[in-house]
């Protein structure tokens, strides 16, 4: 019976405190105890009209008690006390679920990465696998799964609500933690059910000498009797269980043959050691423990940041893999479509060769076909060259960005070393000297006003301060008054600078909003282009189908009306010519779009170069400032 303060389900005040020494020190416990570590704190009486039960709902002398895990008609919804929106807790739950599935032989491949954001199909498969341990004949229903799963969890006694809408998007960041909590609860239920099946809960008589203490049977029986007695009194309204605690402690000591004298001597020795530790702590001048705790908190914070960054990288990697898979599927579909067009062209060529034309007509058609093929081949080469050029420009742009980010990181590291970063640093004076990876058009102007000019002003102020302090050494009293006056002036300057920083932050936020609107605009244009592409493909397929129908009609009437067949064949040739003309126009439009993208990349490259030059200038300025500061 483990009472964990970090997972209390009741929102009422605690009735007991942990001031009493745990019985773990008095009994030789095993680590694999099915009921957890024994901890019976000294109860402290408090008045409470409404108490919470974990197993049901009853009415006692103290008033009505509510059940946390299932009720007999209550309709109020409970709030989940687990930190399901904490990334560290969610990762821990995912790891537990992964280990459980692997240990129990989950069919199919499962990874921790797949459990970060599973699909609805994977969730249903995991749920069915875990539920089969409770009911081996269970089969997942085929209809209205989003209604059946919350109902089954409620029937099992799951105390928290799982909405039907969350079942439609089970892998979303706001719904997956709730579903994960339900799976963890179901997994714990399976473990508890399996533990109860492995051991016999119908205990024999306590005085039976054939009991095996190695199997913990007698100890588990004592635990169950103690829980039953205390729970009955609790449901009757009692808040203290001193008699039950004493009786339980006596039986445990009798069961394990505890030496009272040895226990008493160990307690006295523990008290003496605690007094000695307190005396040493009072006598010590520096508390190294506080420093170590501070360092531990700092390291834990850094570890959490690294874990968050790793999760972000994994999510980015997953997105790139999904995008690559989508592009591969799209490429395969285009290749299949191209193969179909080639077969159709071969069939039409065969039909065309079997038809009766004059040598002049055949020569003219072949000449036009060769010209169109050469045009298409040239345009295809131009398109490939344009795509390769765009790819090279993107690679160069990414390399330039990486170099700029390295220099920015070096600058920020130097600023932290000089205590200029962050905003609350010792030498920042209310300025934000940190450079962030932002490539907007107003970034350079903002950094000049926010970083370069304040740094120059700080250098001038440092030089003036050094000269002033050299002269101030002549008179100590005048120095004190002058320093006080300067402090007052600096406070006013800091207030003004903070106001300026607030205005600059507001301008930055407006610029970010404009960038977001620009991104939405580009996304809308991209959707429009995709729609145009689909419409064009639909028209092409429709034209091909019409051509096929016309060819079939011409074959049926070939021997009846030769002249009419020739006319329809000419119409087919005309339609194919129009189709090739539309294709050529589309290729010209694609080439024009590639040229526009190249111009845009050139502009971005120039902006990055300007940013790199400004960063080099700021780096030189900071190095000069360091040299002057060191010379002081």
Swiss-Prot record:
Alphabetized Pfam families for the sequence: DUF5595 (PF18077), Ndc80_HEC (PF03801), NDC80_loop (PF24487)
Main location: nucleus
A GO molecular function held by the record: microtubule binding
Keyword Coiled coil carried by entry: yes
Keyword hit for Cell cycle: yes
Superkingdom to which the source organism belongs: Eukaryota
GO biological process: attachment of mitotic spindle microtubules to kinetochore; cell division; chromosome segregation; metaphase chromosome alignment; mitotic sister chromatid biorientation; mitotic spindle organization; positive regulation of mitotic cell cycle spindle assembly checkpoint
Coiled-coil regions listed: 263-419, 459-632
Record's GO cellular component terms: kinetochore; Ndc80 complex; nucleus
Keywords: Cell cycle, Cell division, Centromere, Chromosome, Coiled coil, Kinetochore, Mitosis, Nucleus
Subcellular location: Nucleus; Chromosome, Centromere, Kinetochore
InterPro entries (UniProt xref): DUF5595, Kinetochore_Ndc80, Ndc80_CH, Ndc80_sf
Function per UniProt: Acts as a component of the essential kinetochore-associated NDC80 complex, which is required for chromosome segregation and spindle checkpoint activity. Required for kinetochore integrity and the organization of stable microtubule binding sites in the outer plate of the kinetochore. The NDC80 complex synergistically enhances the affinity of the SKA1 complex for microtubules and may allow the NDC80 complex to track depolymerizing microtubules. May play a role in chromosome congression and may be essential for the end-on attachment of the kinetochores to spindle microtubules.
Subunit structure: Component of the NDC80 complex, which is composed of ndc80, cdca1, spbc24 and spbc25.
Family as reported in the entry's similarity comment: Belongs to the NDC80/HEC1 family.
Protein name, as recorded: Kinetochore protein NDC80 homolog
Species, as recorded: Danio rerio
This protein's encoding gene: ndc80
């Amino acid at each position: 019976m483990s009472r964990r303060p970090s997972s209390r389900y009741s929102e009422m005040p605690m009735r007991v405190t942990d001031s009493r020494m745990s019985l773990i020190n008095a009994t030789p416990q095993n680590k694999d105890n099915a009921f957890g570590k024994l901890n019976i704190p000294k109860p402290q009486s408090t008045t409470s009209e409404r108490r919470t039960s974990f197993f049901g709902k009853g009415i006692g002398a103290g008033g009505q008690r509510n059940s946390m895990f299932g009720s007999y008609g209550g309709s109020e919804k409970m709030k989940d006390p687990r930190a399901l929106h904490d990334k560290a807790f969610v990762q821990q739950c995912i790891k537990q679920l992964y280990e459980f599935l692997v240990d129990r032989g989950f069919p199919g491949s499962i990874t921790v990465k797949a459990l970060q954001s599973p699909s609805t199909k994977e969730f249903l498969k995991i749920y069915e696998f875990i539920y089969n341990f409770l009911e081996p004949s269970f089969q997942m229903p085929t209809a209205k799964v989003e209604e059946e799963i919350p109902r089954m969890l409620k029937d099992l006694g799951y105390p928290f609500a799982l909405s039907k809408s969350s079942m439609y998007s089970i892998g979303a960041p706001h719904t997956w933690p709730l579903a994960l909590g339900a799976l963890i609860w179901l997994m714990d239920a399976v473990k508890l059910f399996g533990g109860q099946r492995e051991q016999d809960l119908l205990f024999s008589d306590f005085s039976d000498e054939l009991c095996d203490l190695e199997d913990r049977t007698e100890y588990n029986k004592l635990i169950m009797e103690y829980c039953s007695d205390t729970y009955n009194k609790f449901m009757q309204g009692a808040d203290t269980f001193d008699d039950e605690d004493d009786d339980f402690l006596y039986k445990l000591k009798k069961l394990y043959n505890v030496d009272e004298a040895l226990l008493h001597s160990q307690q006295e020795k523990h008290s003496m050691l605690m007094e000695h530790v307190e005396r040493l702590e009072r006598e010590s001048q520096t508390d190294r423990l506080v420093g170590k705790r501070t360092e531990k908190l700092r390291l834990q914070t850094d570890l959490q940041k690294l874990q968050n960054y790793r999760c972000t990288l994994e999510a980015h990697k997953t997105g790139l893999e999904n995008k690559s898979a989508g592009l591969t599927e799209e490429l395969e579909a285009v290749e299949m479509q191209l193969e179909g067009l080639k077969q159709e062209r071969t069939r039409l060529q065969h039909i065309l060769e079997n038809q009766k034309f004059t040598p002049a007509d055949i020569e003219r058609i072949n000449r036009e076909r060769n010209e169109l093929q050469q045009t298409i081949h040239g345009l295809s080469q131009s398109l490939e060259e344009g795509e390769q050029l765009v790819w090279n420009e993107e690679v160069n742009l990414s390399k330039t960005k990486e170099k700029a980010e390295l220099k920015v990181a070096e600058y920020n590291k130097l600023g932290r070393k000089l205590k200029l970063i962050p905003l609350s640093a010792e030498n920042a004076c209310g300025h934000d000297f940190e450079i962030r990876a932002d490539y907007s058009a107003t970034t350079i102007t903002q950094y000049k006003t926010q970083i370069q000019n304040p740094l120059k002003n700080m250098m001038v102020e440092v030089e003036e301060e050094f000269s002033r302090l050299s002269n101030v050494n002549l008179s100590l009293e005048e120095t004190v008054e002058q320093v006080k006056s300067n402090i007052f002036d600096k406070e006013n300057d800091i207030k003004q600078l903070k106001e300026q920083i607030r205005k600059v932050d507001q301008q930055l936020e407006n610029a970010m909003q404009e960038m977001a609107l620009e991104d939405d605009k580009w996304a809308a244009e991209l959707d429009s282009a995709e729609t145009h592409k689909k419409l064009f493909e639909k028209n092409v397929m429709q034209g091909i189908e019409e051509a096929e129908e016309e060819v079939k009609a011409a074959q049926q009437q070939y021997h009846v009306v030769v002249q009419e067949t020739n006319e329809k064949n000419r119409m087919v040739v005309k339609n194919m010519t129009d189709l090739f003309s539309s294709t050529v126009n589309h290729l010209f439009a694609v080439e024009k779009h590639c040229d526009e993208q190249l111009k845009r990349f050139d502009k971005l490259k120039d902006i990055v170069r300007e940013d790199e030059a400004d960063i080099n200038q700021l780096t030189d300025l900071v190095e000069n400032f360091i040299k002057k500061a060191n010379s002081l």
